[in-house]
Amino acid sequence: GTYVVRQTKAATGVKLAPDFTVLVGETDGEDKPLIVHNEPVTAYLRVVKVDADDGEVIPWGGAKFEIYDPDGNKVTQKVTYPKAETISVFETNDEGYFITPLVLPYGEHYRLVEIEAPKGYKLMDAPLIFDVTPETIKVDTENNIEYVEVIAGDKAVQPTVDSMATGVNDSKELLPLKETTITDKVDCTDVIPGKTYTVKGHLRLYSTGEPLLDKNGERITASKTFKADKDFSGHVEMTFTLDASNLAGEKIVVFQELYRGENLVASHTDIEDADQTVSVVAPEIKTFAKNGAEGTKDSKIVYSDSKASIVDAVSYNGLIPGLEYTLLCNLMDVEAGEIFKDADDKEVTATVTFTPEAAEGAVDVTCELNASKAAGKKLVAFETLSYDGEEIASHKDIEDEDQTVEIKNRPRYSHEEPKDNPTTGDTGIGPWAVLFAAAVFVTSGFLMFSYRRRKKDTIQ
């Protein structure tokens, strides 16, 4: 008859022989030997790199390993494809695993040693022990290979965050505007490629250390969610929008926290960190109004001419250089308390636009006016400094003498009676009297000449 022969136990290090059949017929009673061939136990090694916290595969290469056999010898494998080389270090691919190019022989207590961790992770604390035995071998039926799989988990490196907060034009300053922005450039280091993070930030007042609140009493916050791809630069930006109109002279500090999922993994909350700090400037202006005409003895007197000018010399400090500002000058009637209207019934105002190179400086604003009907009036220059249409400083003191000029008629010279008892060097004769005497002398001479001429003509 026909029999199936099945091996139920094999020697150490070899596989069970596959089943085979034998035909037993009528014999002469002699035994016939059967030859059984046992293949040695071998398998490829497949190592998968995972995150030790969540068990997810780390989906990029860079993890490097060495393999040591049960006798403590480093495993090397010689290959000819794609090039001839001897491999002693095995590296994970971009899918987070590697398979040895050649099989490993039967053995217990192989050691897998990580010599370089993937980006964002720490090296394994200890080698991983694995066996190449029939009990540990898996079969990949699709590729018809046998392998031993080892899952190698790494702990993530603790990430860090640092930042540089900036205001206008990448400076460290803000203008006290109703709406302005702070840009926070955050550097995230040791984040895990492939993982998703969120940077959250809020603003604090340096003077109190307390959170800066908006008009609704809520924290002023910003956030940015990003995925740390393989080529992630580590840089993200957040923008905070705030009302700084009442914060002139204050310092604002940005605090950041880095989350991976719901877990806080890093923070930067140093109230003394200058890199995280932006200052709100406190612009100030002072003025000195004067007659714009040249050669005037008293600069605070403006004559009642139809074409008069008043120059307001404005000094400023606390500006952010490189920005364009506008100065508006309104001439105010001190008595009326309103903008002065000249003889042409025009309100007298003037503007000048300038871009300072330094935080402090000066600029002139010239007001042209018809002052022919303004004699006796006092005018005060009111100044408003604005940026992008929003007032940031002003000087409007109706009683400020430096801002004040007086309109007067030009002086007229007239004949004066001689003074009694003139002193030495004083003839008592005014300049007009001298001119009058000269005119009389010339006229008398002319009349005498004409009389003599007529008399001579008559005799002839």
Regions found by a protein language model. Give the residues of each.
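Solvent-exposed loop/turn and edge beta-strand elements of beta-rich ligand-binding domains
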Residues: 1-460
